[in-house]
């Protein structure tokens, strides 16, 4: 979207048109195109769900999880969800689980170290997540914790479905940068310190 806005602005300047209107028009077109694609992706995803089953997800963007659940309702599918909390910002608990609850679904938040146990004990049918980037070489990049959940799902024979589209900005996984953020965030929960002073933290993120 940003690169498209820059292109639209340059073209507007060259043609003498209003830059703000050109940028706004581009954003509207880009978002409409994006939401249309997301809705189609949601339909394909829900088609993979059992008529009545259990789905585990991971810090799912509100747009796609909302469309996924909308399509599940339209298809008459009874779905319950397990959602890892996604520390240290708790996006899974605060955002994803809230959307699921607001749309009337049975949703349970679990800590980030529980997915394997829940998969084995609760009969998870599908693991699905969004993708911050899908590289052209096939690599999928999402929240760091997604990696371990996908491995667990593979171990238990649970199908994994990723929602998203290939990103031309990432031809290979080598173009993806895993950022090392402030480790202090892993030593606290919502601003409340949970580790002793002097303990080190480690916080890789994308």
Residue ranges and their predicted role:
Residues 86-206:
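Conserved phosphate- and dinucleotide-binding cores of soluble alpha/beta proteins
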Residues 1-109:
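N-terminal active-site beta-alpha-beta segment that forms phosphate/nucleotide-binding
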């Amino acid at each position: 979207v940003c690169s498209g806005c820059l292109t639209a602005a340059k073209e507007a300047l060259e043609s003498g048109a209003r830059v703000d209107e050109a940028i706004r028009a581009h954003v509207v077109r880009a978002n409409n195109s994006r939401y249309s694609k997301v809705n189609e992706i949601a339909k394909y995803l829900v088609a993979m769900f059992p008529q009545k089953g259990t789905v585990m997800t991971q810090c799912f963007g509100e747009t796609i999880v909302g469309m996924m659940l909308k399509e599940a309702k339209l298809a008459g599918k009874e779905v319950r969800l397990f959602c890892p909390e996604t520390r240290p910002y708790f996006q899974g608990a605060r955002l994803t689980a809230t959307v699921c609850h607001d749309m009337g679904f049975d949703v349970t938040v679990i800590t980030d170290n529980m997915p394997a146990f829940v998969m084995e004990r609760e009969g998870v049918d599908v693991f699905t997540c969004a993708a911050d980037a899908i590289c052209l070489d096939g690599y999928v990049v999402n929240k760091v914790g997604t990696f371990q959940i996908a491995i667990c799902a593979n171990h238990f024979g649970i199908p994994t479905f990723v929602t998203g589209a290939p990103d031309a900005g990432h031809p290979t996984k080598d173009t993806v940068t895993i950022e090392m953020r402030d480790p202090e965030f892993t030593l606290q929960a919502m601003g409340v310190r949970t580790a002793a002073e002097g303990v080190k933290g480690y916080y890789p993120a994308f």
